[in-house]
A protein has these predicted regions:
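Domain-level signature for soluble enzymes in the chorismate/prephenate branch of the shikimate pathway
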Residues: 1-208
């Protein structure tokens, strides 16, 4: 037989506040793209659950839009990576003066888990880094770094011959960053003969 729980006034007040908030949000309606509303809500829930640090102007704007205003700016990539030791997320500009993304090759415990904006028609301006690995969603793009000095067009053609659709994203300090269509893992056999003495996948992100 089920027993009636004892009254908890504080919990009842919280439940009532939650119901009111849900009702008000539903009454406010949805935007032109319901998936956009879902993405924004997901970002705010993630921000409530974990610390978000940012480095760079574009990263600050995009992170605030995705995760809300509870983001904290840090001085450099070192500080951003250090903050990840206690969990959370780091959002950094792709077009930074130094190729911080290349350092992820030596930090396999960290990886790209999202890219902003994440619209498939837009070029990523900031990458979201986490100590947690991302998994395939069915609609992803991966990020690959190389020190190959070849022209971008030759690198793209070589990867295409191996079955990978690549696009150049950034180049700094002798390193180049490319996006690869789909979810590509670090040990993908198609990358065995990839251009460059130093190269590798540094993570993947869903696209919408």
């Amino acid at each position: 037989m089920l027993e009636e729980a004892q009254a908890d006034e504080r919990r009842a007040a919280l439940d009532l506040a939650l119901l009111r908030a849900i009702r008000e949000r539903l009454e406010a309606g949805f935007g032109e793209r319901p998936d956009g509303d879902a993405i924004a809500l997901r970002g705010r829930l993630e921000a409530e659950a974990a610390q978000v640090v940012v480095r760079g102007a574009a990263a600050a704007i995009l992170a605030a839009d995705r995760y809300g205003l509870k983001v904290r700016a840090v001085e450099d990539a070192d500080a951003a990576f250090a903050a990840l030791a206690s969990g959370g997320l780091a959002v950094l500009d792709v077009a930074a003066a130094r190729p911080w993304w290349g350092r992820l090759l030596a930090r396999p415990e960290l990886s790209v888990v999202a890219a902003l904006p994440d619209d498939r028609r837009a070029q990523p301006q900031a990458l979201v880094i986490s100590a947690r690995k991302s998994g395939p969603t069915g609609e992803d793009r991966s990020f690959w770094v190389t020190d190959a000095a070849w022209p971008d067009s030759r690198i793209v053609e070589t990867l295409s011959q191996a079955g990978l659709a690549a696009e150049p994203l950034a180049a700094r300090g002798g390193l180049k960053l490319f996006t690869l269509a789909g979810y590509v893992q670090a040990d993908d056999g198609r990358l065995i003969d990839a251009p460059g003495a130093l190269s590798g996948v540094i993570g993947a992100a869903p696209v919408f």
